Amino acid sequence: MLIYLNSLADDILLGLYRIGKGREEEKRGEQELLVEMLCSEVELSHNEDGKPLVEGYHISISHTKGYVAIILSKKHQVGIDIEYRSERVKRISKRFLRSDEHFTETEELLTVWCVKETIYKLFSEDHLTYQDMKVDIQNKIAADVTKSRKVAFVIASTREYILTYAWL
């Protein structure tokens, strides 16, 4: 079920779709959301790294409990991530936080996790690690410290999830 569809800037489209449980529901939700976004059926494939591909578009897809989110553009590289709210992020924070990132609250940790996933997808060809990325939540800037690149990101959140996205 379509929850949200919006044109963000230029030719960038963002869509959010409610889905059921399981991988088949995720696939069906992706296809249905793409039809809503592009007003026609398109072939969705994946490269050897698992990155989604739609001919003529830069695309990024994310799933979480009950949702699929897609951002796409003809001109801009894009990245997106959505995460269901959970305390689990506190247990895994050491995996994605740098030693100079001192976040402890669930909201901050979920945001940093989402942003790093978004940036990873944005620069997927570079195969960044979580340690290669530094997040400034207050200024909504993420940095790829390996190449001194900085990217602005957007945060959208509800009681159920946190969604982040970015484009170049």
Where are these regions (language model features)?
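Core catalytic alpha/beta fold that binds nucleotide/phospho-ligands
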Residues: 1-168
